[in-house]
Design a protein with these regions (language model features):
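A binding-site-centric feature that preferentially detects glycan-recognition modules on secreted/surface proteins
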Residues: 1-118, 123-193
């Protein structure tokens, strides 16, 4: 028997066949056959992310070839050897950074407040980069995070600060010139007190 009736793009014939034909339809109508909604497949569990950062403070990081000198060499290898990126690090904005300010102003505020020592440095950034894109996106999605413990001077005397940002499926180290604009999407990473 063939039915050419369609209800909202569903063929009655397909439903009839799914019930097992005439016999199945009779059992269904006699309440001998129950329809049970198929369980929806569960979403795969989120991968377990490792937020524990380990930094070998005895190894100095490599700098770009345009590098001339560190502004604060005493901070180059400072900081804890191990910390939880979720709980031991905070994103910090300078006063006025909710809109747009120059990097020079952020640096001046950090120096004035004696806060540079609480900032993460390039060593930390390289260790965070090794944690991978999933960890970075979980904590810093859509942001460039700056490592003010490693402000450097180039051969022309201009100051830059390293940062981490996502590029495709990678965490990339970049450098921000202090004469550039910073916004709320460009926080400093600092160790929590």
């Amino acid at each position: 028997m063939k039915y050419n009736v369609y209800l909202e793009d569903v063929s009655v014939e397909a439903v009839f066949n799914k019930l097992g034909g005439v016999g199945g339809a009779k059992r269904f109508l006699a309440d001998e056959l129950l329809l049970v909604e198929a369980p929806k497949p569960e979403a795969p569990p989120e991968p377990v992310l490792d937020f524990l950062v380990r930094v070998d403070r005895a190894v100095k990081p490599s700098y770009p070839d345009w590098f001339k000198k560190l502004e604060n060499p005493e901070l180059e290898c400072s900081g804890p050897a191990e910390y939880d990126l979720q709980t031991a690090v905070q994103q910090w904005l300078a006063s006025g950074q909710e809109s747009v300010i120059k990097g020079d102003r952020i640096y001046a505020q950090l120096k004035k407040d004696n806060a540079l020592a609480s900032c993460l440095n390039l060593q930390d950034g390289l260790a965070i980069q090794q944690k991978g894109i999933a960890v970075f996106r979980k904590l810093f999605a859509g942001k460039a995070v700056f490592l003010w413990g490693s402000v450097v001077q180039n051969r022309l005397g201009l100051l830059s600060v390293p940062c981490l940002f996502e590029y495709g499926d990678e965490v990339v180290v970049g450098w921000g010139w202090l004469g550039s604009n910073w916004s709320s999407l460009d926080p400093a990473l600092r160790f929590s007190k």
